[in-house]
Amino acid sequence: MGRSISVSFGLLVVFLSLSGTGADQDCLPGWSSHEGHCYKVFNLDKTWEDAEKFCTEQANSGHLVSIDSKKEANFVAELVSQNIKETRRTDFVWIGLRAEDKRQHCSSEWSDGSSINYQNWIEAESKKCLGLEKQTRYRKWVNLNCGQPYRFTCEI
């Protein structure tokens, strides 16, 4: 009897210690939790606009991923590397950032409306949409043609 209470108490302590750490983040099945947000790599080829629309249809607050820190960039890069299915279109993965016009390097906010607090461009070109590049292990942002279909990562 005393042993059973000890085990139950131990499990309660573990549960309570995980509460509030992000470990209790409720994500949809197949989604991964990181610092209060949920992420999923989709192995579907879509244009930037279609990928963004698809992400908004996943949940009320869904968008293409916005990357706000090096820590989040590393998490997303690892998630993409582990979940992307190899095809000829896996060299790039859409993120939620694009230029408002060709004269601008980028818009002033991510597709979810948040400000750009972290930047990690590999090069500057005149294309409007940004993605992660396989050659950099999905850690650097590259300018891409918005109309090309690539895989993508959603965040809710």
Curated annotation (Swiss-Prot):
This is Snaclec A1. Keywords: Disulfide bond, Hemostasis impairing toxin, Secreted, Signal, Toxin. SUPFAM superfamilies: C-type lectin-like. Belongs to the snaclec family. Expressed by the venom gland. Pfam families: Lectin_C (PF00059). PROSITE patterns: C_TYPE_LECTIN_1, C_TYPE_LECTIN_2. It comes from Macrovipera lebetinus (Levantine viper). Shows greater sequence similarity to the alpha than beta subunits compared to other heterodimer snaclecs. Its main location: secreted. It is found in: Secreted. It comes from the Eukaryota. InterPro entries: C-type_lectin-like (IPR001304), C-type_lectin-like/link_sf (IPR016186), C-type_lectin/snaclec_domain (IPR050111), C-type_lectin_CS (IPR018378), CTDL_fold (IPR016187). Heterodimer; disulfide-linked. Residues 1-23 form the signal peptide. The lineage of its organism: Eukaryota, Metazoa, Chordata, Craniata, Vertebrata.
